[in-house]
From Swiss-Prot:
Designated gene of the protein: HBD
Subunit structure, interactors included: Heterotetramer of two delta chains and two alpha chains.
Natural source organism: Carlito syrichta
Gene Ontology CC entries for this record: blood microparticle; haptoglobin-hemoglobin complex; hemoglobin complex
UniProt protein name: Hemoglobin subunit delta
Similarity section: Belongs to the globin family.
Length: 147
């Protein structure tokens, strides 16, 4: 559960309705893989990830980024039940993929940066603070199975 004020919840959902999940998702996952290159080990089947340009133009990175943001959209629709919303994904990432849960926090922070880049002055410090709460809640929900 994310503790947002009514104004924060309205602001994050209003902005989220404007997000192009394909563009933002691809950029967020691509940036994660470039900025934190050790995360690339989970994406061996994605082909060429040898340079930042290769990562950012990789069709599989873009497609998976869209998939990630579609799941995040489900969370945005269920901010009061993030653990339930992400229970199956938490189990998958813990038991089968063995993803370090710290990577969820890293991706959340990258997503906030990408949102700031895409929305400029619309992405006020107050909105950033609210989104930091959301991505922290999503990261905690995804890490829940690890506890």
């Amino acid at each position: 559960m994310v503790h947002l004020t009514a104004d924060e919840k309205a602001a994050v959902t209003a902005l989220w309705s404007k997000v192009n999940v394909e563009d933002v998702g691809g950029e967020a996952l691509g940036r994660l893989l470039v900025v934190y290159p050790w995360t690339q080990r989970f994406f061996d089947s994605f082909g060429d990830l040898s340079t930042p340009a290769a990562v950012m133009s990789n069709a599989k990175v873009k497609a998976h980024g869209k998939k990630v943001l579609n799941a995040f959209s489900d969370g945005m629709a269920h901010l009061d039940n993030l653990k339930g919303t992400f229970a199956k994904l938490s189990e998958l990432h813990c038991d089968k993929l063995h993803v370090d849960p710290e990577n969820f926090r890293l991706l959340g922070n990258v997503l906030v940066c990408v949102l700031a880049h895409h929305f400029g002055k619309q992405f006020t410090p107050q909105l950033q603070a609210a989104y930091q709460k959301v991505v922290a809640g999503v990261a905690a929900a995804l890490a829940h199975k690890y506890h």
